[in-house]
Each structure stands twice: as structure tokens, then as C-alpha cells.
Amino acid sequence: MQHLIDKANTLMEALPYIRRFSGKTIVIKYGGHAMADEALKESFALDVIMLKSLGINPVVVHGGGPQINETLKRYGIVSEFVKGMRVTDAATMQVVEMVLTGQVNKEVVGYLNQHGGRAVGLSGKDGNLLLCRKLLQEVRQDDGTVESVDIGFVGDVVKVNQELIQTLEHGKFIPVIAPVGVGEQGESYNVNADLVAGRVAGALRAEKLILLTDVAGVKDKAGALLSSIRLDTVPGLIDDGVITGGMIPKVTCCVDAIEEGVRKASIIDGRVLHAVLLEIFTDVGVGTEIHR
């Protein structure tokens, strides 16, 4: 009997969150280990479908770095990175677009649909969903000066066609977006998936942005998870060395999204089964929430 009572208590805990998020949009960046492990893939698909069935509008933006690396290796193309960004020449861009739009996107869409969803795959080129310009990477030189480096067909999103996404939402579909953007001349751009998720969330004024990662969230210097971070404390946490390395662009992405109108953003542990549901519908969550 106790386990039944526990289930009832879990449902009661979720009720205010179901009411709060009903009719709202949640943008989820899907990547990392959650895309490789079969149990986690199924868990993610069921979480997204559950959100839709509860009247919430999930929008999925996926990555695909490991799949890109594998395919580039097969073609004998060696990747170079500048501050974590892949230098993307024309040959590399062809592979990136092929993998993200023709392989990974279709796999994610197929998995959601196999589990009862109504997912529709998109790239940023469809309906000019993600209009981009070339991103120049700033690199600090030995003499302290900062130089803008051209890293090829790497883009920054300057405009999101939110009408296309909203049309799909109103039709009860789940948009699944590959992070390939389009330039003014029709050229393709490789765009960081976290950046795409943040820009899409901002354009939609989403209730929440969720980034799935392979870590528990943001930790303090003692290694303890910071479950909540106020927006105005982020610069100090970076200066103090609490937020470091690859976590800085993720947190910055969340900050930018909130400043563009997103209510809250979370960096969560995608290695946890049903991490999305646990983050949204429980009091504690499974990562770090960033808010005003």
C-alpha cells in the first residue's frame, strides 16, 4: 500500500507544475550521453511525449558532435577546433549538414514517433527557420590583444522564424530542430546546438529552457551542486572560478535566453533516467536552475 501512496504523493507534487506549464513552451537541447544510451533515449522520448500529452509544447534542438566526428573520420577529414568551435570549411560543412539533417534529426524524429509522438524534423534552412551570419571567434594572442578569427561556415543566429514553430505547435506536432542555419545567400552554417536552443527559446518567449549535459549541473569549488543561481550572480561566479571551462558558454547561453524573455533556464544531468520530467515536475529538480 505504501508504494501506492508514494505514487499518489508524486502526482500531487507534480500538479502545480502541470498547471503552471500547461499551454507554455519548453525548449530542450538534447545531446551528450542521453543520445547514445538506449535506455536514456527511450526515457527522453517518453518524457517529451508526456509533456505534449499534458498540454505543454516541447521544442527539441539536438546536437550530434560524436556522429559528426565519426563520419569525418570515415571520410578522412581532420577536424581543427578554436576555443571549442569546429573549424568548418566547405567539405566539413557538407558532412556536418548531411549528418545533422539526414541522420541524427531523422533518428530523433523516428524515435519520438515510434513511442507515440507526432514529431516533425526541421533544419534551420527549412522556412528560413534560423537565419545566420558568419561567427568570428575571438582569440586572445600572447601579447594580450584579441583577434577575430574566421573559422569557416560557423554561424550565429540573428533571426528565428518563430511562426513556423508556432504553426507546428498549434497543429499538435513536436518540432525537432537540427542546428544547421542559413545565410542571406543561401549558404549553410554549422551552429552550436546550445546557442540554437537559447535563441529559439528567446524568440518563442519560452517558459523554460533546458540543456541536457553529461554533468550534474553547476558545482561550487567544493564539488557540491548549485541547485539555483540568480542571474545577477553569474559574472561573479565566473570571475571567482566557480563557473569554468565548457560550463561558461552553457551558462552564458542560459543568461542570454533569460534576458531575451525566457522565464527560467536549467542545466541538467542527461545521464539520469527521466531527467526532463524530474526537472520540470519535482520541487528539487536534477540540475542547476538559472533565474532572475
UniProtKB/Swiss-Prot annotation:
Enzyme Commission code(s) on record: 2.7.2.8
Record flagged with keyword Amino-acid biosynthesis: yes
UniProt GO cellular component terms: cytoplasm
Binding residues for substrate: 64-65, 86, 190
GO molecular function: acetylglutamate kinase activity; ATP binding
InterPro entries reported for this sequence: AceGlu_kinase-like_sf, AcgluKinase_fam, ArgB, Asp/Glu/Uridylate_kinase, Glu/AcGlu_kinase, NAGK-C
GO terms for biological process, alphabetical: arginine biosynthetic process via ornithine; L-arginine biosynthetic process
Family note: Belongs to the acetylglutamate kinase family. ArgB subfamily.
Protein name stated in the entry: Acetylglutamate kinase
Organism in which the protein naturally occurs: Geobacter sulfurreducens (strain ATCC 51573 / DSM 12127 / PCA)
